[in-house]
Amino acid sequence: MDLQRVRALRGPNLWSRHTAIEAVIYCEEDERSIKGLVDFEIQLRTLFPKLHFSNAVSSHEHISMAHVIEHVVLGLQAQAGCPVTFSRTVKASHEGIYQVVVEYSEEAVGRLALDLAWSLVSAARENKKFDLQKALHELSNLDEDVRLGPSTGSIVQSSVERNIPYRRLTDGSLVQFGWGSKQKRIQAAETSDTSAIAEAIAQDKELTKDLLHAAGVAVPMGKVVDNADDAWKVAQELGSTIVIKPRDGNQGKGVAVNIKSEEQVRTAFEVAQHYGRKIIVERYMPGQDFRLLVVGDRLIAAARRDPPQVIGDGKSTIVQLVEEINKDPLRGDGHATPLTKIRIDDIALATLSKKGLQAESIPIMGQKVVLRNNANLSTGGSATDVTEDVHPDLAASAITAAKMVGLDICGVDIVCEAVYKPLEEQGGGVVEVNAAPGLRMHLNPSYGKSQPVGDAIISMMYPTPENGRIPVVAVSGTNGKTTTVRLIAHVLRTHGHRVGMTSTDGVYIENERIDTGDCSGPKSARNVLMHPQVDAAVFETARGGILREGLGFDACDVGVITNIGEGDHLGMSYIETVEELAEVKGVIVRNVAPSGHAVLNAADPMVVKMAKTCRGQIIYFALNSHHPVISTHRAQGKKVLFREKDEIIAAIGSKIIHRIPLANIPLTDHGQIGFQVENTLASVGAAWALNIDWKLIEQGLASFVSDAKTAPGRFNLFKHKGATVIADYGHNPDAIRALVQAANAFPANNRHVVISGAGDRRDEDIRLQTQILGEAFDSVILYQDQCQRGREDGEVLALLREGLVGAKKTKDIQEIRGEFLAIDLALEQLNPNDLCLILIDQVEESLNYLQKVTKP
């Protein structure tokens, strides 16, 4: 076996809507069926006893080593606790090549699972040992390390259930919800609306206490000190049991409670100063420790927190009892698990010492030993849900505390005897207000039921029916994508949207280019959706990006397929046929939202077949108003667009909805340029699907300018000494045919064409381009461009020349090296009333050159 390529498919893709690892594997002839591999399966199942082959692989005859890798990768992740179920192996047309696709929940885990699966299968093949438990432990640890923690994870899960898109921005807990101008962000239990001032107030415990006291909320009395002598002095003034804690602390770090003696005060002060210079000394409030979670202006959850403790068995030391408790799989070292491991640290030792105990002491049977007096989960405490027991007045105190500090999500710590009574009746009070509160105790309490805190946070950020989505239009096809994308974006701008757009010539935000080059892939789409000044997005969605990484979004409102025709880029990335190419481009149709539309070319059979995969509605378009697909769709009472004489017609069933004169659409040159009429139909379909007002659609079509600046390489017209020059990036047979048809609408004495060929296309596709041109042009200039894309020197020119053999119209054939030299040669030979079609390769450079050298 040979692992030839590994890719992470980070969005909906050719295989599924799941994120997945795609591996291209070459199998030797004897590896294409494990039936002939003696004892291989026995050894494989010895190393991996729970391996399961899916029903799709019915017998050993069909199980290749690539299939084995597939199922081992999936099985390892599943046994490590990852929520994965999808996998698939497809035999490519190349001999011995298989494409293996396996779902992952975390990319790093999926990649590691592939590495471990390769090692396991190799060990089985070579009759060697493999430590399965070590591999599963490694996968499980990595998954725990990289996946979202329980607090952030609960919020993300709630967003998924509400169909709110999300994107993880870092390896940590920073997550974006929504797209463009509707985006919001969280980091754990902080939101993009959480006030920095409020967080600073919450961090200053003395200031917080003053604000709450002013609002009539009960708080413990106390003072701030910066040395141990003053701490003891304040303790004496308070005249009771006290609490010592850092003024700017968090998560219960450095907190000591129930302090009485001078020695205890000084020890606690020293520990607290590890976490802050200023220390609070305040009156100790007897009672139980409760955490109330306030989201917005509502109390969402409440939990009683109990300090970390062990129960003696009469034979184990306290250290041993702690070690036994820490074996609980619910306890971990950080915040990824519901509970945190108990630590024997200085505070724990001091707490034991007050009871006359040490870490090596052996408690008697049934003796409860508390290891610290604060009950934070982050220091090993446990929680019991008491949400339904909270008295309305006590809830009101917690909400007032949150509002006084100014936090949108707030953890209010209250000490009192019971939550079913108001604070005033029991002498309790608010001891702390926390920004970014942990949610674990409410999601997975040790006792009681889980509370839907993630739902509450998402509902605060996006009240129903908001979902954080902006209109998203995805455009794919063989030809016409870029022009269609630009026209749709222009119409949306006419509607008042701030539009983000991606295409093969850049990324545009509000009509300003922010990135250059081919930006028709998922990375550019994600960048647009992350931009806060985008109200609507239009994406050119090319074959390469879909194959390389999948889509840059989970769903689109409109999916437009301009055409498939004879295809392009065939023979690349294991896509050999037009049918396979249609499967790739149809990914956007399969991922149209159920409430959305697919806008499909009714005249292209490959495009029409995509309709059955769409979850939304279909709008068909065609130049021919009587096309059978158009007629059938109309008969079913559905939406269609077509050309009728000199108008574009929008109809639902037999009812005409709107008419647009082609004379009012400059892009089509009064309807003379057929492929631009098709591009316009597709664009109007997208705008119609988004419920844009027809007057605004007409305004957008009338004001759209297609020139070398606004649509570079898309039928750009120049004048040179009385001749017409057309520059276009057409580079496949269908595009050439459309260009020939459009050029024929321009009267000319002589017709000239300048062409090169893309070396990464099939031989027959390169030949066919000049075969088509040879029927329509008097003279042809063949040029070799800078990049041959893997071809030998002169090889592309030879193929282009072969296509002109027997040409009916072409009489003059010239060859030259260099695109600009070819342009110069063509312009020199032009006479007034001639026409020259220049098929450019370096779009921006060639257009700039033409603007300089053409002389109207």
Q: Which residue stretches match the model-derived regions?
A:
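Adenine nucleotide phosphate-binding catalytic loops in nucleotide-utilizing enzymes
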Residues: 575-582, 586, 596, 615-737
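Walker A (P-loop) phosphate-binding motif
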Residues: 464-506
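Conserved N-proximal alpha/beta basic substrate-recognition cap immediately N-terminal to
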Residues: 96-237, 250
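ATP-dependent carboxylate activation and anion-phosphoryl transfer catalytic cores
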Residues: 1-161, 298-320, 347, 351-354, ...
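ATP-dependent carboxylate-amine ligase
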Residues: 3, 11-58, 473, 486, ...
